[in-house]
Curated annotation (Swiss-Prot):
InterPro entries referenced in this protein's UniProt entry, alphabetically: Phosphoglycerate_kinase, Phosphoglycerate_kinase_CS, Phosphoglycerate_kinase_N, Phosphoglycerate_kinase_sf
Protein name: Phosphoglycerate kinase
Family that this chain belongs to: Belongs to the phosphoglycerate kinase family.
Pfam (any one): PGK
Main location: cytoplasm
The keyword Amino-acid biosynthesis belongs to this UniProt entry's keyword annotation: no
MF GO annotations: ADP binding; ATP binding; phosphoglycerate kinase activity
EC nos: 2.7.2.3
Chain residues that bind substrate: 21-23, 36, 59-62, 113, 146
Organism (species): Pseudoalteromonas atlantica (strain T6c / ATCC BAA-1087)
């Protein structure tokens, strides 16, 4: 990859515009989960300590483009940064014609999605962003799969475009896992729908030595093997695809393990009674909400022997404790493994957090959609742009 790294540049006295992913949950004007901001702090501190005039841009939520809405303002992020950084941090809401920023100061530019043309990668808006800086830094892996004015267009027209440490680290970790993995390589793909992750399953099935499916995705595979799934979430129209993937894995000398025991409930609620059953005993009015202990033990053994682990998606409804034992067992097996492990996706990160294994995962990806598209082998527009600018 011919990408320029921000850390290799002399930033002293330069106007540096950093696109970060500060799209954090806010309630009552306060940031309620600061993981993304914390992940971004290293980049900000490096630029500030290098003597740069630092501007940061990000989106927050999904406001109506072209309209200011205080509910989507980055002011709570500015308040947070003022508490944790030792420099002046201010918010600029009218910035397209220029920003007054001094060396060692930080100016946060108001939500880019308030600007008309942001989502469409508008060329005129991109050029306005680019004119604000001497150096454009793309550091938001979570939005690298979107070709938008702040993530893509601005970098095309800026005098210099480079990758920030967060983005560079993410690409390096994912590249290590996918392009030169320690074997055996194992991928866990969970979540609710096969349809949204079918291309991921297909792409990974050609790369990994062992594919594990969980959640609603596993229900479709259970149905494909001729078992009743009752009222469980599954996709009947994708049973042929599941059978094709099962057959392909077998032809390659491997297999996709289908749960042998499951935990069921009669309703989707925190109060639902959990019942352990053999997969062949699921009743018509049952809903499968987790894998059973025998399945969890078998999967944990596969995880224990892996050289590389990619984890995207829980294997059960872990938000409800009675249906969380399967995901907990998977999480603990990954934590105890000596493999190089990567976890990504919102629900996965919530599980990592719930079971307290953050420091046992080799790399935690900040991207959701971008993480999946990278796993699929798709080119990420922001990365392609940085490669072109670095050539």
């Amino acid at each position: 990859m011919s990408i320029i790294n921000m850390t290799d540049l002399d930033l002293a006295g330069k106007r540096v515009l950093i696109r970060q992913d500060l799209n954090v949950p806010v309630k009552g004007g306060k940031v309620t989960s600061d993981a993304r901001i914390k992940a971004s702090l290293g980049t900000l501190k490096h630029a500030l300590e290098a003597g740069a005039k630092v501007m940061v841009m990000s989106h927050l939520g999904r406001p109506t483009e072209g309209e200011y809405d205080s509910a989507f303002s980055l002011q709570p992020v500015v308040d947070y940064l003022n508490d944790v950084l030792e420099c002046s941090v201010s918010l600029a809401s009218d910035y397209l014609n220029g920003v007054d920023v001094k060396a060692g100061e930080l100016v946060v530019l108001e939500n880019v999605r308030f600007n008309v043309g942001e989502k469409k990668d508008d060329e005129a808006l991109s050029k306005q962003y680019a004119a604000l800086c001497d150096v454009y830094v793309m550091d938001a892996f979570g939005t690298a799969h979107r070709a938008q004015a702040s993530t893509h267009g601005a970098g095309k027209f800026a005098p210099v475009a480079c990758a920030g440490p967060l983005l560079a680290g993410e690409l390096e970790a994912l590249g290590k896992a996918l392009h030169n993995p320690a074997r055996p390589m194992l991928a866990i793909v969970g979540g609710s729908k096969v349809s949204t992750k079918l291309t991921v399953l297909e792409s990974l099935s050609n790369k990994v030595d062992q594919l594990i499916v969980g959640g609603g995705i596993a229900n479709t595979f259970i149905a494909a093997t001729g078992n009743n799934v009752g009222k469980s979430l599954y996709e009947a129209d994708l049973i042929p695809e599941a059978n094709r993937l099962l057959a392909a894995a077998k032809d390659a000398g491997g297999n996709i393990p289908v749960p042998v025991d499951v935990v069921t409930g009669k309703e989707f609620s925190e109060q639902a009674q959990a019942t352990l059953k053999a997969v062949s005993d699921v009743a018509d009015d049952d809903m499968i909400f987790d894998i059973g202990p025998q399945t969890a033990t078998e999967l944990a053994e596969l995880i224990k022997n892996a050289g590389t682990i990619v984890w995207n998606g829980p294997v059960g409804v872990f938000e409800f404790d009675q249906f969380g034992e399967g995901t907990k067992a998977i999480a603990m097996a990954i934590a105890q493994s000596n493999a190089f492990s990567i976890a990504g996706g919102g629900d996965t990160l919530a599980a990592v957090d719930k079971y307290g294994i953050e420091d046992k995962i080799s790399y935690i990806s900040t991207g959701g959609g971008a993480f999946l598209e990278f796993l699929e082998g798709k080119a990420l527009p922001a990365v392609t742009m940085l490669e072109a600018r670095g050539a």
